[in-house]
UniProtKB/Swiss-Prot annotation:
GO terms for cellular component: cytoplasm
Encoding gene, per UniProt annotation: groES
PANTHER family, per database record: 10 KDA HEAT SHOCK PROTEIN, CO-CHAPERONIN GROES
Family that this chain belongs to: Belongs to the GroES chaperonin family.
GO BP annotation list: chaperone cofactor-dependent protein refolding
Entry protein name: Co-chaperonin GroES
């Protein structure tokens, strides 16, 4: 994927959620609902502070994150893959193995 986010932006690929119906049928994709977990594919250089300094982001490529799927999250299709573009502040947590 050839994309470089700017500033404090992060590119995330949503992880598909798998769940089961009451009858035990495995649901995936839209039937299971949208996951708020994903893998970080790319990160920007960092947030520009009032002093002009750049503060590096806490997340890195490969991190599995839980994010707020709200107003500021933009969905884009890049190289036939759907990705999310968000600010680091939209990320709520990093899932540690």
């Amino acid at each position: 994927m050839n994309i470089r986010p700017l500033h404090d932006r992060v590119i995330v690929k949503r992880k598909e959620v798998e769940s089961k119906s009451a009858g035990g049928i495995v649901l995936t994709g839209t039937a299971a609902g949208k996951s708020t977990r994903g893998e970080v594919l790319a990160v920007g250089n960092g947030r520009i502070l009032e002093s002009g300094d750049v503060k590096a982001l806490c997340v890195k490529v490969g991190d599995i994150v839980i994010f707020n799927d709200g107003y500021g999250v933009k969905s884009e299709k890049i190289d036939n893959e759907e990705v999310l573009i968000m600010s680091e502040s939209d990320i709520l947590a990093i899932v540690e193995a």
